[in-house]
Amino acid sequence: MELRLYNTLTRSKDAFRPLDPNLVRLYVCGPTVYDHAHIGNARPVIVFDVLFRLLRRLYGADHVRYVRNITDVDDKINARAAERSISIRELTEETYAWFRDDTAALGCLRPDVEPRATEHILEMQALIERLVASGHAYVAEEHVLFHVPSMPEYGKLSRRPLDEMLNGARVDVAPFKRDPMDFVLWKPSTEGQPGWPSPCGIATPGRPGWHIECSAMSWRHLGETFDIHGGGIDLVFPHHENEIAQSRCAFDSGSMAQVWMHNGFLLVEGEKMSKSLGNFVTIRELLTDWPGEVLRLAMLSTHYRQPINWTRQGIGFAAKTLDKWYRVIGDVEAETGEGNPFESEIADRLGDDLNSPSAITHLHHLADVAEHEDASSALKRRFKSAANLMGLLHETETEWRARQRAAVSVDPDAIAALIADRNAARKARDFATADHIREQLASQGIVLMDNKDGTTSWELTR
């Protein structure tokens, strides 16, 4: 199959050709670890996990290196640690553990490397020294700044007019800047802030600017030029634009990454997510009501480059879909080895710029094929293997049911008692009471199923 990816840099969908097929290199901007990750943070994690899985299938697990950084030096971190009266290290360790657990619950593989910014200060200092030596950066009042006019191609990624870039850069036009667009590579630390020995002969301790961190970590773990750089569309400018400027000028190279991929924004019930609107929701909060696999499928139901409208209806539909798919596979194991046509069909669809909605539509078709009364267990195993490529159906039906029950607050004994009351009401022909009990349970996401043998079973749909 041919992998085609949309490249933000070229504004086109092109065939992917790795620089080195023996080592495909992927870098994705990771979290700033100061608080629980929200559902918008989950989108790039899930999207690029699917890409990681697809690359591993195409080139081999030992021939792909996925790096996702951890930003553990930031003004938000400093403020939150002070607010909670704990050390910065305690805060970042705690928050990273939350993030790691949340993404595992979403079915995401761990990246090969998760570098921390604070462990790469030397690389940042080395890059800054290079940029100053080559005339692309300068020292001013204990700051080091990148001089944007020194790079004629600046703005090629975002393609914004200069005045729009200046408004969107969210930088102070300090009097010591040579140009209003110049951005900080290094800044002085005040008392109580983390600090390190400064580069370029600056006497006072300082700390890195945001953009230099990713340039340094990608260089350290992937080299001067690598294959794919990913992140949310909100990072195109200024973050990724500035990364390109720093890295290209430091190494005098034609590119930093061959392909730049960006996932779209997330809305909640049609509105921008914000605490002021009362619709701000963390991954952890959602995991108290839904299994992570449900959230994953709901996220993948929209193409990654399109805005996604996160709704309870969409989550409910994903839950019902997984209920059906797990009924189809039962407790079979996925088919291993090569030659699975179902998996190849899903890979082909994902190969078209990670077209996950198309892949999910085809999984519905494959589920119908595997559900047919004449379907063999081999078809069910193939169907499960195909879904595995998207990080889905990694459990058996028995495990799924148990996890589904554990994800929400239900009392099986209380449900059994209500079912007994309903059966008694039906036997007494008190259908109004029987219907009321069914509706009461349905409002909690519990669906009753009257079986041919006279028994009643139930399942969660949320």
Curated annotation (Swiss-Prot):
HAMAP family: Cys_tRNA_synth. It is an enzyme of class 6 (ligase). The gene is cysS. Belongs to the class-I aminoacyl-tRNA synthetase family. Monomer. It comes from Azorhizobium caulinodans (strain ATCC 43989 / DSM 5975 / JCM 20966 / LMG 6465 / NBRC 14845 / NCIMB 13405 / ORS 571). The lineage of its organism: Bacteria, Pseudomonadati, Pseudomonadota, Alphaproteobacteria, Hyphomicrobiales. Binds 1 zinc ion per subunit. This is Cysteine--tRNA ligase. Its cofactor is Zn(2+).
